Structures are given as structure tokens and as C-alpha cells.
Amino acid sequence: MREIVHLQAGQCGNQIGAKFWEVISDEHGIDPTGTYHGDSDLQLERINVYYNEATGGNYVPRAVLVDLEPGTMDSVRSGPFGQIFRPDNFVFGQSGAGNNWAKGHYTEGAELVDAVLDVVRKEAESCDCLQGFQLTHSLGGGTGSGMGTLLISKIREEFPDRIMNTFSVVPSPKVSDTVVEPYNATLSVHQLVENTDETYCIDNEALYDICFRTLKLTTPTYGDLNHLVSATMSGVTTCLRFPGQLNADLRKLAVNMVPFPRLHFFMPGFAPLTSRGSQQYRALTVPELTQQMFDAKNMMAACDPRHGRYLTVAAVFRGRMSMKEVDEQMLSVQSKNSSYFVEWIPNNVKTAVCDIPPRGLKMAATFIGNSTAIQELFKRISEQFTAMFRRKAFLHWYTGEGMDEMEFTEAESNMNDLVSEYQQYQDATAEEGEFEEEAEEEVA
């Protein structure tokens, strides 16, 4: 079986990671003790991807929980599914990273990283054929961003041919914990561009807007934001967890979604959007699902896809529905909005259907888009970064941990390069190459 090892780092990473395990354990019929109480063979057919089967038929998540302070991990352990994890897989320090990327990446995190790699190695060894890793973390703090990216590069060294997939929560001033978030995020993106194969950009700005505008929550809490994250994560991993043909493993997803190695930052979307604890009274139709799924308001990254073009798209429909109708709707979206899909990648939209819907919904759809509009998100962080960096504000926290200003400048220019690359492919047309060749022939 093709297994995935899950890592969660830092406060945010552990909170959304814990929610992820609650949601998928529920979908696979696994209770908090790890016992199976499901009602469908589909739930067990690919259970090995995320779970180890222990003695006595108990299922244990292939999860490694990491933090530089014990607080969040204690609350995960005492949470609803806290007892399902392997106790040895909790790896934590005592000092904390204090929202400082340098502490997570170079000092405190570097001391803990070998202990984490030992656990990762152990999990990888119990796999029959490991396909890759997924990490949940935020880019705004110290541990998830600094130590998370350190873990990625260390795992990359040791498992160079395995896929590295991250769920990265991008900071926003609307839901801000600290003033140095733009620094931490820029330094992290600098690492993610080079070291991951696929990154789902989960943008706090977008999550906040969805809660506020669509779900009409006047003061969204982290619980509300995490509810959206867990729905999205459950959706984008559906193809990996349930039997199916399309994007059935991380590598096939990467092949379909990533046309150029650096451009692997995806914009996830979800439909229908529901608030925590609410029930859906009316099942949506396939056309409604498709329309909502492509709607800018349903995107988990605060970028408007109408400001860019899609390089590639993967859609996952869940629930009992007519495949024919799904195909018709997806084709209709593409033909009506053809200008928003680059024409030099034919068949760049792929659709999968899974019979098992998420809990509480009859039908749902998840969207994964590789759109050039994601540059808006990087521009936003870059502007905030520059505003502080030109004054060298708060830099002493980083240089005090042994970092050099040079590294900030490099990270900044790498992110700006990424923005220009997206822009370049947004403007590219299919004919460009042909004209150049003709011109050369005439000159000759």
C-alpha cells in the first residue's frame, strides 16, 4: 500500500492537524480509541495510507506531532482524539520559539530536529512503500514556519525521491498574532519554493472573509477558521484515502498539477460552505456545486482567480451523483470561461468523484487550482515585508539568533521572482514560440 506520513509542527499546525485527524477518523469509521465501527468496505480499502494497523485491530495515525513548547500538544492529547496517536510520536521542547523564525530554524528548532527525524524514520520504516510526507503548519509563527521548513529540508535530504506536500497557513493582518508575521512568512516561502512538491496555501485572510461575509459570523474564532481548514483538507485528501482512479497518490497529483517545478502553490476551494455545527437542509445540485466551487468567494486563498489564469485544476466531487452531469458541468465551466484557462496546456482540468460524502452533507465539492492569481497573496506578504524591512524593524530578534540580513534580502527577491514567474505564464500564449522560430528562419 502507498503510505503517507503526516507531520504537524507548531501551535497552528497541531490544531489544524488534530482537526484533520478527527474529521478523517470519522469518515473512515474509526473511534477515538482507534477501533473501527464503520459501515462500508470503502472506508477500509485504503485505510493504510494514513493509519497503521496495530495489534488487536486498532488503527493508529501515521502522525508525528512536533512543537517547541508543550502547551498545544497537551491540549491535543486531552482533546477528543488525543488517545489515538502513538505516545512516542509527540516530540516537544520546553523553550518555545516566540514567533521567531530564526529560533525555529537555526537555534531551538535545530536542537530538537534530530529527535523528530528519529520518529519520522521509525514511521517511514513501518511503511510498505512510502509515497511521501504531508506537513501542516503556519507560516506566520516561529515553530511551524522556522522548524517546519527545517524539517522539510532535512526530510528532503534523507528521502530525496519522496513527495513533500504541505498545508501552509498564510498569515493576514485581519487575523494576526504578531507583528513579525511577514518576515516569518517570507523566509518560509523562500524554503517552500525550493523544497516542496505541492503546497496548499490556506490563507487566514480568505478564511476570515468566508466566515464574516458568507457565514455571517461577526467575530470568527480560530475554531471557525479551523472548521473550514479541516473541511478543505478532508476534501483534497479524498482521492488519496478512498479508492479511485484520478490523482490517487501524491505523485500523480503533482504530475497533473505542477507544470513548472517552482509553481506548486495551490489555491484550495470548497463548496458548499457551512458553519460549525450547522446542518444543511437542502442538497445542492451538481450545477450549483460546480458554480460555487469556482467562485472566488469560496477560495481558501484571498486571491481572485479572475485576475489571473488557471494553469491546472483538479476537482473532487463527493457523494452520490451522476458522473455524466459532473462532466457536463465541468466542460461547461471551461467553455464559458475559456479565457481564464491557459490554452497552451490542453485538458488542464481533471475531475474525480468519490461516493462517500463528508459528514453532514449529501454532496460536496473540493477545488484545487494552480492559478497565476496566487501571486496576489505573495505580493501582499511582500509589501508588508518591505514596509518593515526598509526600516530594519524587529531585525535584532533574528540577527541575535545568528541570522544575516543577507538572508532576508535573498528571501525577498526569491519571492518577488516567484511573482514574476507567475506573471510571465499568465501573459504567455500558445503561439509565441512559433513566431520566434519563423522570424529566425527569415533572418537566416
Curated annotation (Swiss-Prot):
GO BP annotations listed: microtubule cytoskeleton organization; mitotic cell cycle; negative regulation of microtubule polymerization
Gene3D superfamilies: Helix hairpin bin, Tubulin/FtsZ, C-terminal domain, Tubulin/FtsZ, GTPase domain
Top-rank lineage group of the source organism: Eukaryota
Modified residues (Phosphoserine): S172
Cell compartments where the protein resides: Cytoplasm, Cytoskeleton
Motif interval(s): MREI motif: 1-4
PROSITE patterns noted in UniProt: TUBULIN, TUBULIN_B_AUTOREG
Pathological condition linked to this protein in its record: Dystonia 4, torsion, autosomal dominant: A form of torsion dystonia, a disease defined by the presence of sustained involuntary muscle contractions, often leading to abnormal postures. 'Torsion' refers to the twisting nature of body movements, often affecting the trunk. DYT4 is characterized by onset in the second to third decade of progressive laryngeal dysphonia followed by the involvement of other muscles, such as the neck or limbs. Some patients develop an ataxic gait.
Subunit structure, interactors included: Dimer of alpha and beta chains. A typical microtubule is a hollow water-filled tube with an outer diameter of 25 nm and an inner diameter of 15 nM. Alpha-beta heterodimers associate head-to-tail to form protofilaments running lengthwise along the microtubule wall with the beta-tubulin subunit facing the microtubule plus end conferring a structural polarity. Microtubules usually have 13 protofilaments but different protofilament numbers can be found in some organisms and specialized cells.
Similarity annotation: Belongs to the tubulin family.
The protein's name: Tubulin beta-4A chain
Species annotation: Homo sapiens (Human)
Phylogenetic placement of the source organism: Eukaryota, Metazoa, Chordata, Craniata, Vertebrata
